[in-house]
Amino acid sequence: QGAGAAAAAAGGAGQGGYGGLGGQGAGQGGYGGLGGQGAGQGAGAAAAAAAGGAGQGGYGGLGSQGAGRGGQGAGAAAAAAGGAGQGGYGGLGSQGAGRGGLGGQGAGAAAAAAAGGAGQGGYGGLGNQGAGRGGQGAAAAAAGGAGQGGYGGLGSQGAGRGGLGGQGAGAAAAAAGGAGQGGYGGLGGQGAGQGGYGGLGSQGAGRGGLGGQGAGAAAAAAAGGAGQGGLGGQGAGQGAGASAAAAGGAGQGGYGGLGSQGAGRGGEGAGAAAAAAGGAGQGGYGGLGGQGAGQGGYGGLGSQGAGRGGLGGQGAGAAAAGGAGQGGLGGQGAGQGAGAAAAAAGGAGQGGYGGLGSQGAGRGGLGGQGAGAVAAAAAGGAGQGGYGGLGSQGAGRGGQGAGAAAAAAGGAGQRGYGGLGNQGAGRGGLGGQGAGAAAAAAAGGAGQGGYGGLGNQGAGRGGQGAAAAAGGAGQGGYGGLGSQGAGRGGQGAGAAAAAAVGAGQEGIRGQGAGQGGYGGLGSQGSGRGGLGGQGAGAAAAAAGGAGQGGLGGQGAGQGAGAAAAAAGGVRQGGYGGLGSQGAGRGGQGAGAAAAAAGGAGQGGYGGLGGQGVGRGGLGGQGAGAAAAGGAGQGGYGGVGSGASAASAAASRLSSPQASSRVSSAVSNLVASGPTNSAALSSTISNVVSQIGASNPGLSGCDVLIQALLEVVSALIQILGSSSIGQVNYGSAGQATQIVGQSVYQALG
């Protein structure tokens, strides 16, 4: 063993000696501290007394070829102010069954008294082919210092363990502005060993090494500190997040480890906990799940088999005044995304996104459960609710999105969106259940109701929107899309506003105007359409209010009319729902019930009938005006089935009377020429009068349809019996003028 340079004076620098080369058997060598092939150790530099001294540790010896142990390299012990040093390198392991040398065990830079010191941990030794282990890096403990953890050793090729990464803190900086990075783990073995080096695991069934466990930057006292967490292991390593507790500090959570290829579990990433004013942070990402049955991580992506997805960054994005943050990504299986909780004045935040459902039968993740923006103390805060998770493909349930609860004066918020339903038989997600804008203390607040979730192909239902603010303006929720089978469409609830003089949509009381909610679209099969806005179109307690009822659903929905109880108000009843495509009945529109003096109202419109044999909707059932001197109009009846009228007219064409009328029309048109508008007008008039005389029960519309069909039949007969010469395609406009003039003369 060669002795190193012992520099004891101020500013001295020394390098450890190299050990000698030993014999080929078991002797110990020297020469600059390189150990023998047996078990030699290299001595490090002991620059112990002077300020500003720098030194490097010795290199460990080469291990023996038989069963010897590799040497250890001693680190630099720099105990003075501002000193910097690097740990020693571990020795090479033996080729047989011996252990690989440990890395520099000494401190990288133990500059305990002064600021600004920097140091790096030692590198672990190369493992042997049997079971060698890598070294550990030591931390830097000085004020304001920056340090990096040591690198783990390379694992063995057989069943040995890979080296552990730098276990010490990357930079335990207690002063202002300190920054540091955690250590990297060692590379794992190719067989079943445990991994290290950034947490890369083994290729077989071994467990991945742990990543940098120390905090990226624990800048606990001052502002502006930044740090990043360590990388997790491949198997089950965890990445430690940045714990930035100082004012204005920014930090990012650690990344979880990559899951194993067998059955390992993915790591979970811790979020950034920024508790001071104005701080911003992002939650950590979970680890990637295993390909077999392991649990996932990394942004919450789940396993490909049946494992559960890892949880996303659960910590709050930012809990400070005016701070903004985003929740973590939920897991693919059942992970939840935590929303941003901004509890200070005027803060803005967005809720987390729900997790993706599993591919088997797992449940879809819940949307951001935290409040989008809980701006409880100040005015003008804005926030958006979380988005619901995607449902599973099997039988899982879609997620729910929590709305924004803005309780401050004049606050504005939007409700969350409901989750997508699954493809099997699960239920579609409910829309944002929270209030659109619960601005209970001040006037003028605005908010929008939530959108109902898309129904599944089974029986999903849409959500409802509620708006309860004083003087606020809010819109009711939109009903969900109905299912394709027999499910029911969602209901859209109107806005129930209890204050006066508010202006907006959906049932604002007072002098304002409101509109009812929209009903859901009905199903394509035989399901029932959603009900229209059930809330009052305009429940006005004052004079002059105006409102419109909600639109009914596609199947058999009903539109609730405007229930106006005020004096002098003008209201219109609701519109009936669109009939179903099969045999559904059109909706009924409730009329306007105006109970005050001098009020004027119009009845509701009936629904459109079905395309098949459905009935047309009934007109406005309510009273047009129940007051003295009032003027009102009755409701309009529904439009009947157009298809049934046309089919009936076509069936009458085969009667002998119709054939006689067509023959007479052919004779008149041929004798008068093709461009004689007077002859065409006379022919149409004669056919209409003859049909009406022979069919006294037909309506005027039915007679007109029958006459036009017979005139078209006559024209086809003329074309089929003629020799058609050159056709002037450019004079089609002249023909349309002739037909229009003839119809006007015959029926006008």
Swiss-Prot record:
The keyword Repeat applies. GO terms for cellular component: extracellular region. Keywords: Repeat, Secreted, Silk protein. It comes from the Eukaryota. Its main location: secreted. The keyword Secreted applies. Disulfide bonds: none annotated. Sequence repeats lie at residues 1-25, 26-38, 39-66, 67-96, 97-130, 131-158, 159-191, 192-204, 205-235, 236-262, 263-292, 293-305, 306-333, 334-360, 361-394, 395-424, 425-458, 459-485, 486-512, 513-525, 526-555, 556-582, 583-612, 613-642, 643-655. InterPro entries: Spidroin_C, Spidroin_C_sf. Major subunit, with spidroin 2, of the dragline silk. Belongs to the silk fibroin family. Highly repetitive protein characterized by regions of polyalanine and glycine-rich repeating units. This is Spidroin-1.
